[in-house]
């Protein structure tokens, strides 16, 4: 069984003006596709062939891990975004954020700050730890919470390819627009899982 590039949950131009169709074409159509292609080439004829993406991530290292994790991370990222989304969360997500960070405004400020200052790392995540508390963590390269006991709820990709076409070197601008796209329904499903 080989992996395929998962379909985007929206049209390539659906996130404009926050993320352009051109950025999606390169980020999804080139970067994400390359990780899928590389992973398939690396696992062909190995013990990883036929395993799920999550099984590969939890039991591999090196190039296999990097490509598998990037496929998973990017798929998760695309699902964290939605057109006509954003705003503040409601329900259980709002309650969990308030319990862990004091308020949505405090969480948003801390998450944005972590992502802006994330120069050694490439992904910033909101996770639910095994004790039920929410936390903001950053992972480097292809790092993913799947290798820990934390449950990923939300992520932002802060590799330059995620924003350079639209925002050049202005990562804060990208983060400001990210909040207009956050798919809180997806976050709620992850929290409930």
Predicted regions and their residues:
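Feature for soluble, non-membrane regions of globular proteins
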Residues: 1-193
């Amino acid at each position: 069984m080989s992996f395929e590039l998962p379909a985007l949950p929206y049209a390539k131009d659906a996130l404009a003006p926050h993320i352009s169709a051109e950025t999606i074409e390169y980020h999804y159509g080139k970067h994400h596709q390359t990780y899928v292609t590389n992973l398939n080439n690396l696992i062909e004829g190995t013990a990883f062939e036929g395993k799920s993406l999550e099984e590969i991530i939890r039991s591999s290292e090196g190039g296999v891990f990097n490509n598998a994790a990037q496929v998973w991370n990017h798929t998760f990222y695309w699902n964290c975004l939605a057109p006509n989304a954003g705003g503040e969360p409601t329900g259980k997500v709002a309650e969990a954020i308030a319990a862990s960070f004091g308020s949505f405004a405090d969480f948003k400020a801390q998450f944005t700050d972590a992502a802006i200052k994330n120069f050694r790392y490439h992904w910033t995540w909101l996770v639910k730890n095994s004790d039920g508390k929410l936390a903001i963590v950053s992972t480097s390269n292809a790092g993913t919470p799947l290798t820990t006991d934390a449950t990923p709820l939300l992520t932002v990709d802060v590799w330059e390819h995620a924003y350079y076409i639209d925002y050049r070197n202005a990562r804060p601008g990208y983060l400001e627009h990210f909040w207009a796209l956050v798919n809180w329904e997806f976050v709620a499903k992850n929290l409930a899982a």
